[in-house]
């Protein structure tokens, strides 16, 4: 029998029966320098509301021994240990072994190729703690955790509560951490290794940042900014939620081979890819700020107050995604962060919400496996945008009042969505029951356009819209620019809403100006060409972003060509003044040229993008971003200029080599020489990325083996290598690998949720396929794990839209 996924009914029954008093977890890491094993002893003290009843504890690790109140237990073969004959108060002791920390979920051993040092991280969301030690792996059974960790003497061990007692034991040291506050199992963590550490004080908090030793110089470079952002975020959330972060110590640990970041209470784990080896661009620094504040928001929304079950996963993640942008705009230098959100995640969410995996933001979750499949664009950027609209709908002051009441009422407990709705409703005068049903329990996206009825402008919805507040901006030409003549907020609840207060005539009316709601828009028929032509002249980053969002949505819906969208985007880029959107817009238009344009149009559109990059490169503040864009789009002539401009910039040289390899240049010797002098411990991945782009059967075979079969590429680098592997114009070489992708589907979920999402989406072929292949892939995935199925269905729908766009003449 395979490892079973916990169902909601099982969780509710167990929660009604069991109250966990505490976890005492003893972990032995001393075998890791020379092998893959972790040994754990988990002691769980809990009470039972019905003495004599039976339940189970989760343990998908190898069970060496298990006793309940001194009586030996027999583990099942489904990742569970039956617990019969429960007493009123119980002590469960389970000794377990995780025999493989290289590919199994829950805990991961990484070896730094620079110096051979070993690092260990754990990451448990949604239910992967059970692969390491025995626990009640569900969010509502919160309890204090006391971790004791034995590790090699040269290592530092980090966990949630900080300030451990450390005992010397010869070649090892034993770290005993104080009790955590009541936490869900998935919010606990152990990170270990010979870290480079930096500490600062800020606002009464003891802040630490950690990375592997080979990245010490990079960590030192970025530490000031990380500490500044951390202090700003802690102060903002303390005021916004009327509750300071209750623990003095707040650590952030940058780990190798980690995907994304994880909000463990008081000890956030990051991928060390966020420590950029090259000087970070503005967009990369802004992303660092957004992720830092996202994970920090979880300290309150997720850790202090926790969802009762995974049907409120959306709220956990959407709230953190909303709050990080709210805090970044209000407390940091990244004041255009909502424009960046629109240019990136929100555009992805619009596309996802119109595809085969569109779902209500809040939906019943049968089991944890289903929960793992909705860490998606609807949960994150759409959810964040909906919460932004909720704050607009009720007013920010009342929103803050409601949030403060929510945290005061439910601290260290668990809640449902209704608890939050009740707190916000009590703080204001809005009926949120209708809002909740329309926004959270109904799938899909509203669409608005404008009609003119004499002198009256009518905002027209496609169907009955959700209750919302949005704005319509009126713009007039002033020379070569557009200036806003009026901005009218409109409260919408009916299919047709008159908009009063607009000028009698305007050169452009922009629906959803200021981007206050989550809705797609269409210009009126007479204004379509105007919007495409003058989007670049709009006066703010957010207004230009709203126009770009409309153009993008029309492209993905088959209502605009890639050439039209590309011309609009290149014009916007040439005029753009906000660093928050230049890089995401450049990525978007490059993707349009590569992935959406017909073969006949691709060279001209790619050349146009390269021309904008050369123009932007004349601005010293944007030179780095522009040259990176040039590295994706340059012809042989452009590459020569890129080489001249790159000088000793190792990052740009790697990027140029990828493009030169794709174009058929012999870069083998130069790649080897650059690998030799690149100080980045992960430079071998850059060399493999160059190799992946080479239009040669041997290069493709080697890359596929390392990327998809052996999985030696760190998960955070899979996307970059895969993008170099799947290149336009190489269909004959790539066609066999499209078939191999289908053969890989049954094992795409190996390694846990994050690898499953990454491998499924990034390896899906965008070239060397047709619409029949997309249908075959969608059929082949029907029996796969939910996270693989949903990820593949979403990605394949996007590729289907790309194929349609490529078949359309400009």
What are the language-model segments listed below?
Residues 50-52, 87, 165-172, 203, ...:
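Short, glycine- and charge-enriched coil/turn segments that flank and shape catalytic ligand pockets
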Residues 1-248, 349-353, 375-381, 392-397, ...:
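Acidic/His-enriched low-complexity segments
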Residues 14-27, 144-145, 223, 327, ...:
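Charged, low-complexity, helix-prone segments enriched in Lys/Glu/Asp/Gln
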Residues 97-100, 112-120, 125-127, 142, ...:
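Extended hydrophobic/aromatic-rich secondary-structure runs
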Residues 177, 209-464, 591-592, 607-608, ...:
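Hydrophobic alpha-helical and helix-loop surface patches within well-folded domains
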Residues 67-68, 148-151, 213, 297, ...:
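Non-catalytic accessory/interaction domains
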Residues 61, 338-339, 705-710:
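Charge-dense, low-complexity polyampholytic segments
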Residues 182, 274-275, 692:
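Hydrophobic pocket-lining residues within nucleotide cofactor-binding pockets
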């Amino acid at each position: 029998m395979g490892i079973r996924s916990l169902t909601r009914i099982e969780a509710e029954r167990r929660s009604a029966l069991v109250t966990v008093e505490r976890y005492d977890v003893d972990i032995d890491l001393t075998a890791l320098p020379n092998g893959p094993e972790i040994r754990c002893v988990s002691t769980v003290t809990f009470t039972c509301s019905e003495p004599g009843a039976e339940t189970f504890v989760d343990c998908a690790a190898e069970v060496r021994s298990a006793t309940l109140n001194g009586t030996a237990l027999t583990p099942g073969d489904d990742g569970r240990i039956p617990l019969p004959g429960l007493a009123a108060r119980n002590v469960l002791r389970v000794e377990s072994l995780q025999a493989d920390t290289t590919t199994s979920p829950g805990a991961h051993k990484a070896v730094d190729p620079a110096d051979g040092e070993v690092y260990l991280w754990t990451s448990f969301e949604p239910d992967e703690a059970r692969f390491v030690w025995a626990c009640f792996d569900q969010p509502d059974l919160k309890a204090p955790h006391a971790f004791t960790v034995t590790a090699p003497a040269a290592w530092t061990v980090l966990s949630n509560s900080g300030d451990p007692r450390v005992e010397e034991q010869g070649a090892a040291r034993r770290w005993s951490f104080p009790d955590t506050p009541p936490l869900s199992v998935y919010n606990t963590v152990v990170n270990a290794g010979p870290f480079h550490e930096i500490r600062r004080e800020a606002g009464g908090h003891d802040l630490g940042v950690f990375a592997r030793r080979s990245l010490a110089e990079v960590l030192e470079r970025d530490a000031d900014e990380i500490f500044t952002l951390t202090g700003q975020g802690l102060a903002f959330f303390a005021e916004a939620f009327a509750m300071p972060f209750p623990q003095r110590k707040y650590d952030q640990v940058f780990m190798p081979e980690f995907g994304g970041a994880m909000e463990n209470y008081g000890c956030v784990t990051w991928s060390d890819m966020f420590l950029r080896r090259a000087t970070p661009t503005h967009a990369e620094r802004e992303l660092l700020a957004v992720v830092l504040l996202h994970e920090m928001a979880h300290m309150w929304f997720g850790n202090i107050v926790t969802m009762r079950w995974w049907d409120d996963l959306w709220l956990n993640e959407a709230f953190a995604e909303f709050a990080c942008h709210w805090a970044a705009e209000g407390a940091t230098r990244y004041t255009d962060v909502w424009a960046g959100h629109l240019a990136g995640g929100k555009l992805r969410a619009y596309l996802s919400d119109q595809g085969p995996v569109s779902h209500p933001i809040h939906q019943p979750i049968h089991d944890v496996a289903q929960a793992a499949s909705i860490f998606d664009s609807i949960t994150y950027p759409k959810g964040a945008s909906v919460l932004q609209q909720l704050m607009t709908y009720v007013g920010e002051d009342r929103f803050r009042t409601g949030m403060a009441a929510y945290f005061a009422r439910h601290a260290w407990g668990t809640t449902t969505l209704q608890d939050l709705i009740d707190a916000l409703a009590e703080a204001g005068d809005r009926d949120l029951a209708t809002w909740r049903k329309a926004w959270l329990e109904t799938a899909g996206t509203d669409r608005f356009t404008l009609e003119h009825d004499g002198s009256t402008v009518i905002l027209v919805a496609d169907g009955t819209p959700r209750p919302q507040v949005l704005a319509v901006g009126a713009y007039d030409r002033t020379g070569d620019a557009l200036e806003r003549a009026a901005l009218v907020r409109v409260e919408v609840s009916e299919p047709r809403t008159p908009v009063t207060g607009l000028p009698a005539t305007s050169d452009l009316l922009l629906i959803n100006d200021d981007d206050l709601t989550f809705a797609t828009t269409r210009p009126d028929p007479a204004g379509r060409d105007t919007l495409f032509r003058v989007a670049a002249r709009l006066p703010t980053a957010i207004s230009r972003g709203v126009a770009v969002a409309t153009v993008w949505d029309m492209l993905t819906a088959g209502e605009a060509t890639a050439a039209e969208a590309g011309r609009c985007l290149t014009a916007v880029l040439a005029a753009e003044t906000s660093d928050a959107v230049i890089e995401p817009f450049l990525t978007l238009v490059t993707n349009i040229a590569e992935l959406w344009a017909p073969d006949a149009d691709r060279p001209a559109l790619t050349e146009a993008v390269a021309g904008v990059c050369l123009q932007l490169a004349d601005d010293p503040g944007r030179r780095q971003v522009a040259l990176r864009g040039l590295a994706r789009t340059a012809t042989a002539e452009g590459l020569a200029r890129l080489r001249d401009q790159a000088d000793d910039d190792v990052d740009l040289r790697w990027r140029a080599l990828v493009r030169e390899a794709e174009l058929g240049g012999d870069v083998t010797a130069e790649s080897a020489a650059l690998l030799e002098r690149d100080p980045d411990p992960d430079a071998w991945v850059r060399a493999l990325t160059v190799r992946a782009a080479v239009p040669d059967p041997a290069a493709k075979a080697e890359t596929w083996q390392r990327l998809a079969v052996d999985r030696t590429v760190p998960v955070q680098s899979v996307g970059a290598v895969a993008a170099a592997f799947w290149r336009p114009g190489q269909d004959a070489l790539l066609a066999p690998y499209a078939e191999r992708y289908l053969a890989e589907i049954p094992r795409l979920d190996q390694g846990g949720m994050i690898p499953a999402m990454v491998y499924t989406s990034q390896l899906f072929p965008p070239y060397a396929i047709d619409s029949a292949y997309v249908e075959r892939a969608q059929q082949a995935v029907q029996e796969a794990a939910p996270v693989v199925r949903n990820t593949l269905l979403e990605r394949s729908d996007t590729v289907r839209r790309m194929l349609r766009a490529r078949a359309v003449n400009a």
